[in-house]
Amino acid sequence: MLTERKKELIEKIPKAENHIHIEGSIPWELALRLAEKNKVSLPVHSIEEIDSWAHGLIGERGLDGFMICDRTLNSVCLHEEDYEAVVLALAEEDKRQNIVYQELHLDYPLNEERGIPLEVVMEGYRSAQRKARELYGVEIVYIAGLDRTLSGERCLSFVKSLRPYLDMVAGLGMDCEEKGHPCIKHLDSYQEAKRMGLFLTAHAGEDGGSDNIWDALRKLNVQRIDHGCRAAEDPELIRYLKERDILCAMCPVSNVYSGAAASFEAHPFLTLLRAGVPVSISSDDPPYTNSLTEELMTDAEKMNLTEEEIIRVVRNGFAYSIQGQGYLPAFDAWVREFQRKGAD
C-alpha cells in the first residue's frame, strides 16, 4: 500500500507528460457525443460497452487489438472543432492532475485514411494548443507521429507536409504495430525531419526486439525512445542509453495491459531506472489505461518506488522534454517545500 505521504506527493506534484496519443486518448464520453453529432455509427453505444469491447479486443490481440479500437473511436472526428474539442478535453483533465506541460503525439494518418484534410486536423489542434494555455495553463507540444505500417514514401510525404506547421509541431515520432515494420523503413522521413529541425523520437522495443531500438538510435539518430521495454534485456544497450543520457518514455500500465510486459513485477522499468537510464512515466492512452496520476500511483505501489525515485521520474519528464526545461526551477522549489514540510 502507498503511504499517505506518497499519495499526496503524486497528486500534488507538478507534472510533465512525454508520451500520450491524441487519437488514442479521446475521452469515451466525448467520443459518444461526437459520434451522435456527426452521425457516425459505432459498434458500441455506452461507456460500459466501450470498456467491455476494448478489453476484449486488447486482451485477445494485444497492440493489434488496441489499434482497432483506436481507429474505430477516432472515426468520430470529422471537423476542425472536433479535433479542438479532443485536445481541450485533455487539457482540462491536465489541469485537474497538475500537468503543466504535455507532449501529445498526433497521428494524422489515422485521419488521412478517412479522407480528412491535413489542414482540418492541424488547425483544430493549433486552436486547442492556444486555448489550452489560456484556459487551463497547460503548455501543449505536438509530436507528429508516423504510422510505421505505411510505406516509406507515404510517410516522407507526410513529413514534408508539416512545413507549414513548424510553429506548432516540435517533434517527429513513429508508432503503430511494430512487428514486421522495422524503424529503418522510415530513414528518409527521419532525415527530412532532422533537416526541418524537429526533435526525433520513435516507439521501439514495445512489442519488437532490442534490434529495433538500436536501429532507432544508430540509424534514425533519435533523441528519445518511446517505451523501450526490450532495452532491459541488452546490457550493452542499457550502458548506451545511460552513457548518452537518452530518455525512455515508458508507460508501464499500458505495457502490462497490451502484453508488452508480463506483469508489473517483470516490467523492465525498474531495471532501467536502477541502472541509471533516464526514464519517465506517461499514460499513453488514458481511456484504456489510467490517467497520469493513476498511472504514477499504480506504478509506485506495484514497483515499490521510493519517494526519491518518484520525484526523479517525474522530474525527468521536464528535464528530458522537448521544450519544458523552463519549468524545472518551479518544480524543484515545489519539491524542496514538500520535503521541508515532511521534515518539520
Can you name each region flagged by the protein language model?
Residues 203:
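Short HxH-centered metal-ligating active-site micro-motif
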Residues 1-198, 207-215, 219, 223-224, ...:
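Metal-cofactor-binding active-site regions of metalloenzymes
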